[in-house]
Amino acid sequence: MENLEVMVILFIIVVLGYALCKLGYMGDKFDQKLSSIVIDVTCPALILSSVMGTELPDRSLILPLLGVGFLTYVVLLVFGFWVPRFVSKDRDEQGMIGFALMFANVGFIGYPIVSSIFGPKAVFYAALLNMPNTFFIFTVGVMLVKGVYGVKNLNPKVLLSPAMIAAFAAALLVAFSVHTPDLIARPVTMVGNITVPAALMVIRSSMARLPLREVVGSVKVYVASFLRLFVVPLSVYFLFKVCGVSDLVNQINTVVIAMPVASFGTMFCMKFGRSASLMTEMTFVTTVASILTIPLVTMLLQ
């Protein structure tokens, strides 16, 4: 029931973004500025706030969890760069679909669902498992959205992006068991909490300007959505099960990557001047479909 409530809350925020666009409060220029604020300000705050709670995870689990997290994204690289060529022949669309297959919306949906299934302490483990996401989404993710491939096209400055700096800082706080004073933790958490509603409203606002035919989505959108919500997480689950990863870690990791398409896809499209049509379609369809698929996937893991 809690899983369903989380998904309904998310859907309400998405609908709000649509209404704000239709009423004239949101539009192209506003959405672009808000996207930049989310990427450069509120997202780093959200990352830091994930390690500013009253409890910190067992330090002995940091490296194993980070290792599983990085291996997960190595596996997802195969999905991101190889599978899309079987879904679309268009190079730009392949990049967008690759992003959708690699990156899930963990921040708002993933953590609450992990908490409801495995207990509050599991959120810390989910945060560690998802930490490599920050590195890959701001490197490989940007590469896929921009349609510029190859290591030589990877800008080293991305390692100094606000989100990456926040991820490094968060890792240090956990490694050295630093408990952040409430005077600092509370404002950081408040700013970080802006990320999810802002990102979701931007997604729906951008979709409000699309023709109804595009909102409904094409066959390739539904194929990509099925891969995103079912094939990708279950493939990773069974692979790591064979490799001997503990059941708890494997289950948490699977739930984390079984979420809808990451909202950063639309943010990146707007920031880098790319067409957000396909990305917003996949984000919208997976968000709506996940109301049913997430409970189903979690049941399969029990």
Where are these regions (language model features)?
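Alpha-helical transmembrane segments of multi-pass small-molecule/ion transporters
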Residues: 1-302
